[in-house]
Amino acid sequence: MNSVRKTISSRILYVICMEVQYFGRYNAFLTVQNTSATVKIPVEISESEVEIMDTNIMKRNECLAKTVIKGLESRNMSGYYAASKEEALKQALELIPEESTIAMGGCVSAREIGLVEALEKGNYNYLDRSKMSPRESLMAAYDADIFLSSANAVTNDGILINIDGNSNRVSCIAQGPRKVVFIVGINKVCSDLDSAMKRARNVAAPVNAQRFDLNIPCRETGKCFDCKSMDTICCQFLITRFSRHTDRIHVILVNDTLGY
């Protein structure tokens, strides 16, 4: 690895580090590209080097989260940083009083940190929408104490971006439930509103199209076609740039890759 460091730029090395951290393994491919070809060169990385990389990435993620939290606070929203899924679960439960009524959209991130399981086992009134009709679920969610969600993207300065097909999720974020708790992986942080919208439309939407087996172009191509299909998942776009109601919106930023 040291010999490789001498021949590649720090920027390319950083990309390799991110790939190692993401895949959680001790080898990676260095991608070298010019105008005529792209070549992948296997690179071996020791366990100690991976630990150093992971530490540096974690420090960067924490700094980034602090920037986002500052932006959220300037918009009358609360932000928190969790260094792990376990910390995220602990923080989420601190925001959810026992015996409260909790609703949720199809939030993969909440499941990934173990929050749904904890609510089902604990002293909470967790509304399982799979046991209700869509209309019953929506009406119950509007009157809930807590609504759980993730975001399709969040900007460095604290703007939340969400796209919805049936609009149950974005409508509950906008109004209704007394408190909204977001579980957001650091992978969803984007530099600005434009890049956040691109992520929502070209990453989150195509993946969810696969997840729900929708008959729309992005399911086949992996990118947005701005379609008007009856199955389109991009019916409503919600940009949350400020919360008029203090203590309503809480965002937990997690040092992990969560959701889509």
Could you say what each language-model-derived stretch is?
Residues 2, 6-7, 34, 41:
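Polybasic, lysine-rich low-complexity intrinsically disordered segments
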Residues 61-148:
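N-terminal active-site beta-alpha-beta segment that forms phosphate/nucleotide-binding
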Residues 142-260:
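Conserved phosphate- and dinucleotide-binding cores of soluble alpha/beta proteins
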Residues 28, 38-52:
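Short, Lys/Arg-enriched N-terminal segments with co-localized hydrophobic residues
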Residues 52-61:
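Glycine- and acidic-residue-enriched helix-capping/strand-helix junction motifs
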